[in-house]
Amino acid sequence: MSKIIVLQGTPCSGKSTWRNAYMENQPIGSTVVVCRDDIRLELNNGIFTLKLEKEVRKLEKQRIIEGISSGLDVIIDATNLNPKTIARWNKLASKLNCEIIFEKFYVPYSVAMKRNRKRKAEGGLYIPKKVMLDFYQRYYPEGLSI
């Protein structure tokens, strides 16, 4: 039975690092990664715009369905912290009759921002401080004081 692995965590919490390590240990062609950042990169050079998010969400769901329908496991690499998003993935897994696993990632805000600055210095995607603060205020307020 195919499975959906939902990665959950703020930006810079280690989701993609975990994903990459996991993929190294999977047989080639057995698992597909669906990543909203990658879809944004394909559509708009990685630039986030609210206007484009409807298309990003549509492609994300389409790719998940295609993967499971092809007998593959699917990793959903995004923050996946919003309760509506979690409910959507549970509903989709039920509809597709597949297992769903949630892998949770947490680091304090200070650690995430340190990783964010390092990512920027290495030429990677930088998440604005305001966006990072919003994630922590909304989902992990206790992590702001650490």
Region locations from a protein language model:
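Conserved GTP-binding G-domain of TRAFAC-class P-loop NTPases and closely related GTPase folds
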Residues: 2-8, 13-28, 95, 106-146
